[in-house]
Regions:
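Rossmann-fold NAD(P) dinucleotide-binding segment
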Residues: 57-68, 72-110
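NAD(P)+-binding Rossmann beta1-loop-alpha1 motif at the extreme N-terminus of oxidoreductases
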Residues: 1-61
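Class I S-adenosyl-L-methionine
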Residues: 22, 41-44, 83, 107, ...
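Generic beta-sheet signal
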Residues: 33, 94-95, 119, 146
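A generic structural signal for alpha->beta connector loops
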Residues: 27, 49, 89, 113-115
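Rossmann-fold dinucleotide-binding core
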Residues: 108-163
Length: 165
């Protein structure tokens, strides 16, 4: 079990991760951050998390698992906002479909001691937004993890064994 899961972005994939995490009891608490107040209010109304904030750095403080669930184009500004708040030993992952670009742009920004394990759940629907998620979205689906060479195998195993996707 993770102590704190921080989800940055709460659309279809992020909200499905939140729901699956709750259903499977994979994290003690879920922190949610998004850039739009209306989306955050919707996530709160749906009860998707335990804490809600427009400040991504606030969401990741104390998190042992952080998953970027924003569009890939937002990764760099999000990473710049959260990098100093990431805890040593935390796992940082994502749900984007492109890995080379993500690893090249974010990898150098990941603080020492943080385990960067990009992921790609092979799942989705034509719907979007917090209300569109459902915990079974990942059932029977692959999630490809793409850790960089030298990534701590214990961290990879922890994410793989505890994965909600």
């Amino acid at each position: 079990m993770f102590n704190k899961l921080a989800l940055i972005g709460i659309g279809l994939i992020g909200s499905s991760i939140a729901r699956a995490t709750r259903l499977k009891g994979l994290a003690k608490t879920i922190a949610i951050s998004t850039r739009k107040a209306a989306t955050l209010d919707e996530a709160r109304a749906l009860g998707l998390g335990d804490s809600y904030t427009l400040d991504a750095a606030e969401a990741v403080r104390g998190a042992d698992l952080v998953i970027l669930c924003t569009p890939i184009g937002a990764y760099l500004p999000v990473m710049e906002a959260i990098r100093d708040a990431l805890e040593p030993g935390a796992i940082l992952s994502d749900v984007g479909s492109v890995k080379g670009q993500v690893m090249a742009s974010l990898g150098p920004l990941v603080p020492k001691g943080v385990h960067f394990i990009p992921g790609h759940p092979i799942a989705g629907t034509e719907h979007s937004g917090p209300a569109s998620g459902f915990p079974e979205l990942f059932t029977g689906r692959w999630c490809v993890l793409t850790p960089a060479k030298g990534t701590d195998p214990v961290a990879v195993d922890r994410l793989d064994r505890k994965s909600v996707v």
